[in-house]
């Protein structure tokens, strides 16, 4: 289990269409589970919620969100795991502006694509994944390429 706290940092100007920061806090509890077999099935899932607060400059509060990241792969026995992964995203509650619901604006997206992971056997690993979004509603759609390195302390 994990608890992330996102704080409003970065530049924000309500008159700009795009901003670096979101200008509101979000509390994000999550549950993570993994099954690792160097010579077989590997499975990872992270299920999390984003409990969003109000942007004080605009009076806008994005609805609460469910995020599920997943990966399913096969260990080749030499540290490499090949497979697929992606995400499921669903906004669960309406956005609100100055306390009033903004109906019909709930976001949704799904993504899937290939994953490649190398596990060093010494605690650190690196993952590359390509995700193509589909069935997107009320948010931008695209393809993302991620490289993630995990190093234990």
Where are these regions (language model features)?
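Outer membrane beta-barrel transmembrane domains
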Residues: 62-153
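Outer-membrane pore/translocation modules
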Residues: 1-61, 103-105
């Amino acid at each position: 289990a994990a608890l992330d706290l996102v704080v409003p940092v970065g530049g924000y100007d309500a008159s700009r269409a795009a901003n670096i920061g979101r200008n509101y806090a979000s509390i994000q509890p999550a549950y993570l589970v993994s099954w690792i077999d160097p010579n077989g099935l590997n499975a990872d899932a992270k299920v999390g919620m984003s409990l969003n607060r109000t942007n004080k400059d605009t009076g806008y509060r994005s609805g609460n969100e469910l995020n599920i990241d997943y990966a399913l792969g096969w260990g080749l026995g030499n540290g490499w795991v090949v497979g697929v992964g992606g995400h499921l995203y669903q906004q669960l509650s309406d956005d609100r502006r100055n306390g009033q619901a903004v109906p019909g604006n709930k976001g949704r997206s799904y993504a899937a694509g290939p994953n490649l992971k190398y596990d060093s056997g010494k605690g650190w690993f690196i993952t590359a994944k390509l995700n193509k979004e589909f069935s997107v509603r009320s948010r931008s759609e695209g393809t993302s390429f991620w490289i993630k390195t995990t190093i234990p302390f």
